[in-house]
């Protein structure tokens, strides 16, 4: 009897996992041919200062530090490299994802352009542009979304939209084109530990 229950349970788990696996395979297939660039591995003190400023009060307990992944990309064709920064950690992530910051270089440091919530990686920088900045494509999932979908975030002259899940899905036949940044696997021990600012 116990063996039969184990078989039934395993079959139910497999059946539940199949749609998720199929969606994940579909997601990977839609990025076929899109160049993938892993995040940079060296800590960047200026990026860290900008993150801490964006977070406000950042004084994590030991083991609760935020980790970050980043790439430098010229998003507005001015010859300077913005930073796309993905934050992970228990205080910054929810069921829909984590936060991604867009930072623009300014006077030897960075200023916050956008704080985009409920995001996952990779971040696709599209060749399409709006108001002089590349569109950003994210995969919206979790947080009550039963079927994930791609959305395009378009610059409005000052910032990008702050929540991908409020935007319409790209059509099922939409071709995802551009470059996928932060393409390495996000894991609990991965990324760079964000240290609190020194007082």
Descriptions of predicted regions:
Residues 93-100, 145-151:
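Structural motif
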Residues 103:
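An amphipathic, basic-hydrophobic helix/alpha-beta surface used to engage anionic
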Residues 60-61, 89-95, 141-144:
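Short consensus segments that form the blades of beta-propeller domains
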Residues 3-5, 9, 15, 19-42, ...:
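Acidic, small-residue rich beta-repeat scaffolds with periodic aromatic anchors
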Residues 88-89, 106-108, 141, 158:
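Solvent-exposed coil/turn segments that connect beta secondary-structure elements
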Residues 66-76, 120-135:
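Beta-propeller blade termini
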Residues 77-88, 131-138:
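Acidic/hydrophobic-patterned starts of short beta strands in beta-sheet-rich repeat architectures
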Residues 24-64, 107-121, 161-166:
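Blade-edge motifs of beta-propeller repeat domains
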């Amino acid at each position: 009897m116990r063996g039969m229950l184990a078989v039934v349970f395993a079959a139910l788990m497999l059946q539940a996992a199949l749609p998720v696996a199929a969606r994940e395979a579909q997601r990977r297939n839609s990025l076929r041919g899109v160049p993938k660039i892993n995040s940079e591995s060296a800590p960047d003190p200026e990026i860290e200062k900008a993150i801490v400023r964006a977070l406000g009060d950042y004084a994590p307990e030991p083991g609760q530090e935020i980790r970050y992944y980043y790439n430098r990309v010229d998003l507005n064709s001015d010859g300077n490299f913005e930073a796309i920064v993905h934050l992970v950690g228990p205080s910054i992530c929810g069921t829909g994802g984590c936060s991604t910051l867009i930072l623009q270089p300014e006077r030897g440091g960075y200023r916050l352009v956008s704080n985009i919530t409920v995001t996952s990686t990779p971040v696709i920088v599209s060749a399409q542009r709006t108001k002089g900045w590349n569109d950003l494509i994210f995969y919206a999932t979790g947080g009550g979304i039963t079927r994930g979908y791609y959305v395009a975030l378009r610059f409005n002259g000052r910032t990008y939209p702050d929540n991908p899940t409020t935007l319409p899905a790209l059509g099922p036949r939409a071709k995802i084109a551009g470059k996928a940044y932060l393409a390495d696997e996000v894991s609990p021990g991965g990324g760079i530990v964000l240290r609190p600012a020194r007082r």
